Amino acid sequence: MEVNILAVIATALFVLIPTAFLLILYVKTESAGS
């Protein structure tokens, strides 16, 4: 089974970018709260 590298990269970015964005927002909110 051939693995499509571009598909893997696209999937990784599609998952990691929103996760990192939400994590940054969460940290900023926690810092502002305290």
Swiss-Prot record:
Protein name, per record: Photosystem II reaction center protein M
GO BP: any one term: photosynthesis, light reaction
Record carries keyword DNA repair: no
InterPro entries attached to this UniProt entry: PSII_PsbM, PSII_PsbM_sf
Assembly with partners or alone: PSII is composed of 1 copy each of membrane proteins PsbA, PsbB, PsbC, PsbD, PsbE, PsbF, PsbH, PsbI, PsbJ, PsbK, PsbL, PsbM, PsbT, PsbX, PsbY, PsbZ, Psb30/Ycf12, at least 3 peripheral proteins of the oxygen-evolving complex and a large number of cofactors. It forms dimeric complexes.
Keyword Plastid listed: yes
Membrane topology, record value: Single-pass membrane protein
Keywords: Chloroplast, Membrane, Photosynthesis, Photosystem II, Plastid, Reaction center, Thylakoid, Transmembrane, Transmembrane helix
Role noted for this protein: One of the components of the core complex of photosystem II (PSII). PSII is a light-driven water:plastoquinone oxidoreductase that uses light energy to abstract electrons from H(2)O, generating O(2) and a proton gradient subsequently used for ATP formation. It consists of a core antenna complex that captures photons, and an electron transfer chain that converts photonic excitation into a charge separation. This subunit is found at the monomer-monomer interface.
Pfam families linked: PsbM
Record's GO cellular component terms: chloroplast thylakoid membrane; photosystem II
Family under the similarity heading: Belongs to the PsbM family.
Transmembrane segments: 5-25
Superkingdom: Eukaryota
Compartments where found: Plastid, Chloroplast thylakoid membrane
Organism from which the protein derives: Chaetosphaeridium globosum
Cysteines joined through disulfide linkages: none
